A protein has these predicted regions:
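The alpha-helix within a helix-turn-helix
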Residues: 61
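Contiguous, often N-terminal, cationic amphipathic patches that form binding interfaces
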Residues: 1-58, 72-77, 83-103
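Short acidic capping loops at alpha-helix termini that bridge into adjacent secondary structure
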Residues: 68-70
């Protein structure tokens, strides 16, 4: 990643997660949380036809225990580095749920 410093961010209606996606993995998993706060995720789906983005939303919804409608990729739809908005979940709750699912 570049010199950007991503962290879990709190907002009025929820939080935002910086995510780095590796498609075509053997399974869906959270690999690690990088020093800059970016969540490294492996997905089994290919990046074609928006499949990886859909898989990411489905996977994060499962991990965070929220409906898919509460998640949105707000930046990075065509790249590996993404910013995902999580509505109605505070930063601390999101952080704890992600750490509980580290590979």
């Amino acid at each position: 990643m570049t010199d950007r410093q991503f962290k879990l961010h709190g907002g009025q209606r929820g939080s935002a997660l910086a995510v780095r996606v590796t498609p075509r993995a053997s399974r869906n998993e959270i690999v690690e949380v990088l020093d800059d706060g970016t969540i490294k995720v492996r997905l089994a789906t290919p990046p074609a036809d928006n499949e990886a983005n859909e898989a990411l939303i489905n996977f994060l919804a499962e991990i965070l225990g929220v409906p898919k409608s509460q998640l949105e990729i707000v930046a990075g739809e065509v790249g590996r580095d993404k910013l995902v908005s999580v509505v109605d979940m505070d930063v601390e709750t999101a952080h704890q749920r992600i750490l509980a699912h580290l590979g």
